[in-house]
Amino acid sequence: ATTHRIPFIDALFISTTSVCVTGLTTVDVATSFTHIGHIIIMILIQIGGIGVMTFTSFFALSFMGKSSFTSKMMLKDMLNEDRTGGLFRVILNILFVTLFIEGIGAYFIYMDVRGSLPGGTQQELFYAMFHAVSAFCNAGISTLSGNMYDPLVADKYNLHFWIAMLIIFGGLGFPIVFNYLKLLHHLLMNGIKILIGKQKHYIHTPRIINVHTYIVVISTLILLITGTAFYLFFEYDNTLGDLPLRGKLANAFLGAVTPRTAGFNVADMATLAPPTLMLTLILMVIGAAP
């Protein structure tokens, strides 16, 4: 699965960083691994991403006792689960939502890189799938040596946007996503019933979006807006200097999104201004949604 012999410790490190969706690498993933190696890494990222996100959903319950009424109510609230015994259904929902969002992301990524990568359609499709998984699972590993500032994709600003959105959705976590899916289902069902005459007006169901969801979404929006603004300000005449306005905005947005959980690079870290490095450190400390 490698193009040349690499030390066992490096292979172990890459496997660990993939399944733990950390994104740190000791070798160039693009040149050190074959296509089979990249597939293995993608599978490890997917397993780790689903595992970590599922684990974090249940982590708060792990020390509280299986039969505790408080635990059951917390589980019901966290996962938006009406029946506390329906954990298998929750796991299936997690798998479905993961594959659905990654599939949509892979489609848009492919449409943006189509005709621009060596290796033809097959390589472009794999690039799209790999990066959709890597972004949604917040791994930050790329099959290009230059990551997101590789010459092949550096000017693909739509690609930067889709990568950022996948990172954001993956970082929010499944309890948040399920909350909004339940709200969407409620709104659609109300609309359909009004259209077919089964009810005359919108029926409000309170507390579909819980307090935890409100806090996470609002804090995420604040961090995205302020992070992008500060990144743009600090790097405007530095790494963003030669880019068009659209490129500056796209790179600043991804540059503010990726430090919190993912690890994709929109520029060589050694070339960033000291204030940008401090901003990156702060965003890394804050991280994603709890």
Labelled PLM ranges:
Residues 1-290:
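Membrane-proximal intracellular helices of multi-pass ion channels
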